[in-house]
Amino acid sequence: MADSSFDIVSKVERQEVDNALNQAAKEISQRYDFKNVGASIAWSGEKILMQANSEERVKAILDVFETKLIKRGISLKALDAGEPQLSGKEYKIFASIEEGISQENAKKVAKVIRDEGPKGVKAQVQGDELRVSSKSRDDLQAVQALLKGQDFDFALQFVNYR
C-alpha cells in the first residue's frame, strides 16, 4: 500500500482579507463613534494602515477589523499588528498578514509530530510548508487532531490530503 500524505501550510486568501478590510471600512464610515475623528483603514502597499486622531479610536478600528477577519474565517494568528504610533496629529497602526511557515516554526511542528505523534509518521520541511506522510491514513488524522490541539503562534491549514 502506498504512503498517504498531507501538507501543513500557513496561507491566507488575500481576497478574504480584502473583503474583511472593505467591510471594516464601511462599518467605520457609518458608525457614530467614528464621525469626525479622521478614522480610516486601507491597504498601504502590502501592509494595512489604520489611522484616527486618538489612540482609543485607532485601537477600536483594529478591533473592528479583527472582528471582520474572524467572520471571514481568517485566523488572527496571521495578523501581525503593531503598536499605535503618533504621527503628527494622528495615531497610526500598521498591520501585516503573515504567510508561510518559517524554518524555525516548521522544526517546532516536526518535533511535536515526532515526539507526540503516532509511530511511523514522517514530517519533512519543504520550503515554507511541511509534508507529513505515513502508511496509515488513521495516523495522519491523529496527527491533524494533535496539531489542532496545540497552540502555535501561527495559523496552520492542512491541504493536499492524499
From Swiss-Prot:
InterPro entries: DUF520, UPF0234-like_C, UPF0234_N, YajQ-like_sf
One GO CC annotation: cytosol
Family matches, as Pfam families: DUF520
Gene Ontology molecular-function annotations: nucleotide binding
UniProt xrefs under SUPFAM superfamilies: YajQ-like (SSF89963)
Gene3D superfamilies linked: 3.30.70.860, YajQ-like, domain 2
Keywords, in A-Z order: Nucleotide-binding
Family per record: Belongs to the YajQ family.
Biological role stated in the UniProt entry: Nucleotide-binding protein.
HAMAP family: YajQ
Protein name stated in the entry: Nucleotide-binding protein SAV_4896
